[in-house]
Amino acid sequence: MSTIIMDLCSYTRLGLTGYLLSRGVKKREINDIETVDDLAIACDSQRPSVVFINEDCFIHDASNSQRIKLIINQHPNTLFIVFMAIANVHFDEYLLVRKNLLISSKSIKPESLDDILGDILKKETTITSFLNMPTLSLSRTESSMLRMWMAGQGTIQISDQMNIKAKTVSSHKGNIKRKIKTHNKQVIYHVVRLTDNVTNGIFVNMR
């Protein structure tokens, strides 16, 4: 199983390499990459099964973010796992935001990686056959409300603007927190911004 790790933190590289080796991946199949240019070349030549990327490698440069977005789109059979660069927050979950793009905390447990990668590790197969989890999506109301919430508007302001009861706003906030698997507003904002950066945003259910 060809794998690429793009993370400037040596501890993370060591941890991921150790995890992959312990799950039977051969050392020669694990490649460390440092730049977006190198990642594009490696993805084209190696067609990796999984790519781990720390968002710090691209998030501060708009052109790098655009290139990462393009690389993800060009390789639908590669699973991209993007680690959030968010400090001092207890969050060890992961979210599938596109069929081949997963946003994860760096605190993800080995057991969770097993759940995600288990079948890919066992068989030389494409990820599309095996990722058995729902893609994160919001209703139109949740999406609109989340944008207002992120713009700093409170429950009463949102209630007035959307012409819905404050209790309904609170209920929608509860749904968003459940879908993004956290009650931490900082994590929610981070997930939204990162998803906006490498995709066209969180899926909105238009029904």
Swiss-Prot record:
GO terms for cellular component: transcription regulator complex. Keywords: Activator, Capsule biogenesis/degradation, DNA-binding, Sensory transduction, Transcription, Transcription regulation. InterPro entries: RcsA, Sig_transdc_resp-reg_C-effctor, Tscrpt_reg_LuxR_C, WH-like_DNA-bd_sf. Degraded by the Lon and the HslUV proteases. Interaction with RcsB protects RcsA from degradation. GO terms for molecular function: DNA binding. Pfam families: GerE (PF00196). It comes from the Bacteria. Induction: Autoregulated. Repressed by H-NS. Induced by the DsrA small regulatory RNA, which inhibits the H-NS mediated transcriptional silencing. Residues 155-174 bind DNA. Transmembrane segments: none annotated. NCBIfam families: PRK15411.1. Belongs to the RcsA family. Component of the Rcs signaling system, which controls transcription of numerous genes. Binds, with RcsB, to the RcsAB box to regulate expression of genes involved in colanic acid capsule synthesis. This is Transcriptional regulatory protein RcsA. It comes from Escherichia coli (strain K12).
